[in-house]
């Protein structure tokens, strides 16, 4: 792990979108707001994303692609980039985690870790 691997901090806030969910059809919509903070000394460009999404039944799906929400932002030192996206699960509980493929101002490629976070409907867990 290089110093660049730890120069990016990822914070996550989740929300269950009840009005667009359909529990009777086993469809639970969640939004997640991601804040990517550059704690390093160089600007870093987010080039790719890789998500691993697991529902309460153990079903796993992967999402890979360029950028996030149609953008490949460059995050200057001591600044943050924020976006909101969403996912649909077949269960009222799930977990997401993954990585962002980043490239530093000096051209070094590195991975920013997105630690596991829970997606859950209100009141399901105490």
Curated annotation (Swiss-Prot):
Record-annotated ApaG domain positions: 2-126
InterPro entries membership: ApaG_domain (IPR007474), ApaG_sf (IPR036767), Uncharacterised_ApaG (IPR023065)
Coiled-coil positions: none
Any one GO biological process: error-free translesion synthesis
Domain of life: Bacteria
SUPFAM superfamilies xref list: ApaG-like
Cited NCBIfam families: PRK05461.1 (NF003967)
Protein name per Swiss-Prot or TrEMBL: Protein ApaG
Lineage of producing organism: Bacteria, Pseudomonadati, Pseudomonadota, Gammaproteobacteria, Alteromonadales
